[in-house]
Amino acid sequence: MTATAQRQLPLDTTGAGQLAQQAELHPELNRAHVRFINLGKTYHGKQGAVEALGSIDLAIQRGEIFGIIGRSGAGKSSLIRTINRLEQPSSGRVLIDQVDIGEFNEDKLVELRRRIGMIFQHFNLMSAKTVWQNVELPLKVAGVPKEQRARKVTQLLELVGLQDKHKAYPAQLSGGQKQRVGIARALVHDPAILLCDEATSALDPETTQSILGLLREINQRLGLTIVLITHEMAVIRDICHRVVVLEQGRIVEQGPVWQVFGDPQHEVSKTLLAPLQLGLPKEWAERLSEYPQRPDAAILLDVHFTGVSDEGPDLAALFATLGGKVQLLQGGVERIQDRAIGHLILLIAGSPHPREELLLRARQLAPRVEVLGYVG
């Protein structure tokens, strides 16, 4: 498996004839809500040209919550902003509902942007206007009649749970309430796509969960396609259906969240997800050696379960097949997208099986098992 594109669709990227061929080979592309084809973005400055994005081939399906992650400067914001043409690609195409938005004139761009909502980290509310007025403003600018505006604002404030705050000013609101106003404002034109740029980064963990719950509800009730970028891996884990990992403007990994988070392939993915992974307890790391120091040395195994779809991994069967005394030093099992993802650090003492047979037995029940070392 190569270092890049482990879970990517093999997309051709040239003319209309090849697009038709792709649609036949990959019918899911016909259903893609947003599609990037060989997308590139280069910025030109005093220091010369800087490539922010290159060779991006990606399809986002209608109604899914799609996450974009990567280190700082990986190209996340540049990519998401090409969807509503706040960024003009240097090469390649962006298709929405199979229509190339690169060919849109100014009038069509205005119409496009009304169909794509966007929320930000810092809310961007007008401090001198009430909650009601902040939500109403885009409708007013668009020339929507007053009675229709009132109906829509009432509906949206109820959706985001702020119907009792309609007369409040931003300074009187908490961070979570401000973001709810931002979400309501982003929905005024009944968008089909909602872009979220670090929408929870300024919020505390409890408020973050409430905003994620609201986004999940909006996705389910309204059928919105949600595309979000964040540096908080737990946000991706908790809400997204699929995720793409960017590094230096290139896609290095993509797939269902349970798959990428449960068994990351690329080194960048592993680094980004490291805070969510279990580490070896310090007291055991200090006692660890690469080779057994005596015949009865205990072996330390790092065991990963990925994508178990029923009740979860059969730990009793695993412990029985390993033999000897099995001690769980650290570990846990969580569910992502109704699949069990487990990570266990096991100490096995007195097993009758030699190392290679032990690994073979373990791998029959868990997809990834590694020897961390020996104790004793």
UniProtKB/Swiss-Prot annotation:
One of its GO terms (cellular component) is plasma membrane. It is found in: Cell inner membrane. Its EC number is 7.4.2.11. It is a peripheral membrane protein. It catalyses: L-methionine(out) + ATP + H2O = L-methionine(in) + ADP + phosphate + H(+); D-methionine(out) + ATP + H2O = D-methionine(in) + ADP + phosphate + H(+). GO terms for molecular function: ABC-type D-methionine transporter activity; ATP binding; ATP hydrolysis activity. Its main location: membrane. ATP binds at G70, R71, S72, G73, A74, G75, K76, S77. InterPro entries: AAA+_ATPase, ABC_transporter-like_ATP-bd, ABC_transporter-like_CS, ACT-like_dom_sf, MetN_ABC, MetN_ABC_transporter-like, NIL_domain, P-loop_NTPase. Residues 34-273 form the ABC transporter domain. Pfam families: ABC_tran, NIL. Keywords: Amino-acid transport, ATP-binding, Cell inner membrane, Cell membrane, Membrane, Nucleotide-binding, Translocase, Transport. Part of the ABC transporter complex MetNIQ involved in methionine import. Responsible for energy coupling to the transport system. The complex is composed of two ATP-binding proteins (MetN), two transmembrane proteins (MetI) and a solute-binding protein (MetQ). PANTHER family: AMINO ACID IMPORT ATP-BINDING PROTEIN, METHIONINE IMPORT ATP-BINDING PROTEIN METN. Belongs to the ABC transporter superfamily. Methionine importer (TC 3.A.1.24) family. This is Methionine import ATP-binding protein MetN 1. It comes from Pseudomonas syringae pv. tomato (strain ATCC BAA-871 / DC3000).
